Amino acid sequence: MAPQRKALRDWLYLFIISIQLFGMLALDLVSFYPKALYAHPSSPLHFLLTLRNFYVSSTGDPFFAQDSPHQPWFDIFLCIEALVQLPLAAYLVSQLASSSNKPTSGPAELAGLAFGCVTFMGAAACCAELWHMGEDVVSADKKGPLLYGTYLPFAVIPAVLAVDMSLRLLPRVQQSDAKAKTQ
């Protein structure tokens, strides 16, 4: 029997989750870092504020604009991102990048399922909020690219990831159930 190779979609997941991991660390979660690391121009991570300001000015993203405070639901989603998505993303990147010839393991598939569900939920909520925002919050010329180019892909791809991982896990669970019934 020929050795199994990593599925092409796993390389796509690695690419997407790596981008998300970078976005979490460089944009989304900066406010959780100690202010001494980023607040002052001489701080070692001050470049992250410059990066965030560039991102906001380029995209018009109202969720990260300095002049609009976060809604409470968004603050909770950032906490979930820090406590759940970040560790899952780091684990998945390490697992998906580990070997070009190794298919995913059960634990990696379970982590992918959890990551996909949580990420889909957060991004879908942002998409819904963005969809309903008026021009007083986000300009019409920025809204479409922001919704369809930035947030929607990070809802759709994790949803596909969650379905894919659940379909991979299902035979493992069924096989385990079959073994348990024969014992």
Identify the residue ranges that each predicted region occupies.
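Alpha-helical transmembrane segments of multi-pass integral membrane proteins
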Residues: 122-183
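Helix-to-loop junction signature of class
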Residues: 27-38, 121-133
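Membrane-helix exit/interface motif
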Residues: 60-69, 88-98, 125-132
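Signature of small four-pass
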Residues: 78-115
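Hydrophobic alpha-helical cores of multi-pass transmembrane domains in eukaryotic membrane proteins
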Residues: 15-26, 83-87, 113-125, 149-163
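Juxtamembrane loop-transmembrane helix junctions in multi-pass integral membrane proteins
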Residues: 4-11, 69-72, 102-106, 138-145
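N-terminal helical submodule of small eukaryotic multi-pass membrane proteins
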Residues: 2-86
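Plant-biased recognition of short, low-complexity, intrinsically disordered N-terminal tails
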Residues: 1-8, 177-183
